[in-house]
Amino acid sequence: MTEPTQPQAAVAADENQIVAERRDKLRALRDQGIAYPNDFQPTHHAAGLQTEYADADKEALDAKALDVAVAGRMMLKRVMGKASFATVQDGSGQIQFFVTPADVGAETYDAFKKWDLGDIVAARGVLFRTNKGELSVKCTELRLLAKALRPLPDKFHGLADQETRYRQRYVDLIVTPETRATFRARTKAIASIRKFMSDADFMEVETPMLHPIPGGAAAKPFVTHHNALDMQMFLRIAPELYLKRLIVGGFERVFEINRNFRNEGVSPRHNPEFTMMEFYAAYTDYRWLMDFTERLIRQAAVDALGTATIRYQGRELDLAKPFHRLTITQAIQKYAPNYTDGQLSDDAFLRGELKRLGVDVTQPAFLNAGIGALQLALFEETAEAQLWEPTFIVDYPIEVSPLARESDTVAGITERFELFVTGREIANGFSELNDPEDQAARFRKQVEQKDAGDEEAMFFDADYIRALEYGMPPTGGCGIGIDRLVMLLTDSPTIRDVLLFPHLRRED
């Protein structure tokens, strides 16, 4: 039978008592003038020692007599009379300290017995293996570097409340190895992407985060004010138009990994600020982009995880296999096979079906929607969530692709794709529209939609049109959601799990 938990008030009272006791200990350290020393430099890290000497037996280590200096957070402590043990965790892993009064002195040993879990400690000593086979540091010098005033969560239960894990990520990182592994994998994936891009002769650039005109995506921006210039500014929703200005300027391959901001809802797939990579390559098209993106994602998985075969939410996913490619209508008919070609070309039927599925077709975005936009909406309701294996959905309608090049063979269709994996969009790319007159006409259409109430429609960017008028070579461009990619690679069900500090409501 499960024991009843303490009332929250009692837990808070206990924690307050612990904090008060630890403050008393800190006060004593201050009185001695040794509260927060900063003169210790580690020579080794726990993981490095564990790896290098994993196969060394007790006799070999005794013969080597390796001197080490290690520092970290004390996670466990066992005081056993004339010999004590502490498990210390640094940024790489854990190692055991072996402490005796004979080695560190009676005064230091007595002080050590009063130290608390969570304290930052340091030791110099000799690496050895205990009789039970545990690789350890036999401490000859032991110091307290930083006093932890707040207690760590119970080691068996950790941070049980999910929101507390997000809000106090610093504690989550201390006590949850899986969280640390997630963010190490994220770093490896991004490093892999950067190397992949560099090896393909792309130049990494930085473009503005504050825009005078929001553009490059259909989204609602955050608005701010520049006091010195007395002008309204927008946090960027996408870097696209600036990156394509660089293509005009002669940089033929560019990419940027940075934050975008969208003043929209929070969900398992959405955070108001998020990390994207956008890249643009002159003299390429959307077919080249799909091949390139597929290779990039596969390599990121291998570099981050050591394999292209991953597991996500209990299901295996082989990123080494060729990614699927389907048109919007092919995807609908694959996952909702009852729809006929005639129905998918019938405006009234599509509107009725969307309404039946719970879509509000009276909202501004649908008022003048054509067949293509209605098909896309139906795809989102019937097929998108079922695209488990990597799938490029291609040939998006021109009315929802204001920056993409129109197909040379099919009227009303653009050379655009979106990549879906596990039912989520991971990437969006297309052959870029480089005709300034066509682009200006599409911007004007977007302005009409905005005036009709569509808050996500684009503004008219006159300077971008001016840039295109200087001539932009045929170009392909793609954006990859880094956060969603990391969710996939780390088996994380929500975007908050892969953001160090996700957005949350104000704390009460």
From Swiss-Prot:
**Which CDD domains does the annotation name?**
LysRS_core, LysRS_N
GO CC annotations, alphabetized: cytosol
InterPro entries cross-referenced by the UniProt entry: Aa-tRNA-synt_II (IPR004364), aa-tRNA-synth_II (IPR006195), aa-tRNA-synth_II/BPL/LPL (IPR045864), Lys-tRNA-ligase_II (IPR002313), Lys-tRNA-ligase_II_N (IPR044136), Lys-tRNA-synth_II_C (IPR018149), NA-bd_OB-fold (IPR012340), NA-bd_OB_tRNA (IPR004365)
Q: Which domain of life is it from?
A: Bacteria
Q: Has keyword Aminoacyl-tRNA synthetase?
A: yes
Alphabetical list of Gene3D superfamilies matching this protein: Bira Bifunctional Protein, Domain 2, Nucleic acid-binding proteins
Please give the chief subcellular localization of this protein. Answer: cytoplasm
Give one GO molecular function term. magnesium ion binding
The question of whether Nuclease is a record keyword is answered with no
Please give the Pfam families that the UniProt record associates with this protein: tRNA-synt_2, tRNA_anti-codon
Catalytic activity reads: tRNA(Lys) + L-lysine + ATP = L-lysyl-tRNA(Lys) + AMP + diphosphate
Specify which residues bind Mg(2+) 2 according to the UniProt entry for this protein: E425
Q: Which GO terms describe its biological process?
A: lysyl-tRNA aminoacylation
Q: Which cofactor does it need?
A: Mg(2+)
Detail which positions bind Mg(2+) 1: E418, E425
- Where can this protein be found? Cytoplasm
Give the note describing cofactor binding and stoichiometry.
Binds 3 Mg(2+) ions per subunit.
Keywords from UniProt, A to Z, are: Aminoacyl-tRNA synthetase, ATP-binding, Cytoplasm, Ligase, Magnesium, Metal-binding, Nucleotide-binding, Protein biosynthesis
Entry EC number(s): 6.1.1.6
- Similarity comment text for this entry: Belongs to the class-II aminoacyl-tRNA synthetase family.
State whether it acts alone or in a complex, and with which partners, per the record: Homodimer.
Annotated protein name in UniProt:
Lysine--tRNA ligase
The organism is Burkholderia pseudomallei (strain 668)
This protein's encoding gene: lysS
